[in-house]
């Protein structure tokens, strides 16, 4: 890029380090000569069962309509969510993944260096990325045992604070705050500060906080949810926010027309009806979590007890273990980009996927031990 063009690029964008997603199966297949069917991906917390059969059936019945623009309002999905959540459709804002709702919050509430955003040290990387993209100052609040320090977050609120992000359960640590502590925090946050509670993994929590009740009584609470995890629709990019009707109207104004495609809306609507798929997903998640924890204990690997569908585990050198497993056709997630260089995050897969992981992981650990500088 010439200096003349570079001078026109926003300074905040020049400094931005792009988000690094989990390695795609297709990339690994090209690099190592694997067939895609030989590869297991345990990096991005996707549902190993895939989408609901009802979603696949609905997609098949509607493929012939893709020459038409989608419903820009998302009427049927909003109505389904309204029934599912027991909240008015006017409280719901659809997004191209819940990431888009995060971006919309910045468009509406925090757009320049006069504002400020708060989030935890080991929080979802997109909060920081969006703050940097918009040129908004931010404070990373130190964690307590890999969890949110809500007391410190309250104390950090200042006159410039516009947005607070709390992922619960948190990604990438898998930790959650107690319902009581969260309720107390929400009651104490000033009315003019928006609190975005990112509940991407809330479907895996047996006793979830009743955060929607706060949306019904306060304008400054926004709930973020996704169909990418429990519902297995990550590739269709569909999520939503739940906010007061007043806030929802402004989020709607900020979004692009037709921001959620027709197939995503159709699949998400059908997925909400499939209780059996959700129960089966929960079953393999809990069984797989127990199995991984038992094996990590046996291998002497410290891990963070998780309330989500993944586990953060200490392996000594996350990049080394990540690369060693890649050579065996297994994709996990190195946590170096999160400042957790000695850790990897592992999605809880199917029984067969975990068997293969647990066969190769000890060999990767042994290789690290033998190659570690003395």
Curated annotation (Swiss-Prot):
Signal peptide: none
Residues with the N6-(pyridoxal phosphate)lysine modification: 229
Pathway: Amino-acid biosynthesis; L-histidine biosynthesis; L-histidine from 5-phospho-alpha-D-ribose 1-diphosphate: step 7/9
UniProt-listed Enzyme Commission number(s): 2.6.1.9
GO molecular function ontology, one term from the record: histidinol-phosphate transaminase activity
Pfam families listed in its UniProt record: Aminotran_1_2
Assigned keywords, A-Z: Amino-acid biosynthesis, Aminotransferase, Histidine biosynthesis, Pyridoxal phosphate, Transferase
Record field: catalytic activity: L-histidinol phosphate + 2-oxoglutarate = 3-(imidazol-4-yl)-2-oxopropyl phosphate + L-glutamate
Keyword Transferase (UniProt): yes
GO BP term, example: L-histidine biosynthetic process
Cofactor(s) listed: pyridoxal 5'-phosphate
Enzyme category, top tier: transferase
Family stated for the protein in its record: Belongs to the class-II pyridoxal-phosphate-dependent aminotransferase family. Histidinol-phosphate aminotransferase subfamily.
PANTHER family: HISTIDINOL-PHOSPHATE AMINOTRANSFERASE, HISTIDINOL-PHOSPHATE AMINOTRANSFERASE 2
Quaternary structure and interacting proteins, as annotated: Homodimer.
Descriptive protein name: Histidinol-phosphate aminotransferase
Organism: Methylacidiphilum infernorum (isolate V4) (Methylokorus infernorum (strain V4))
Gene: hisC
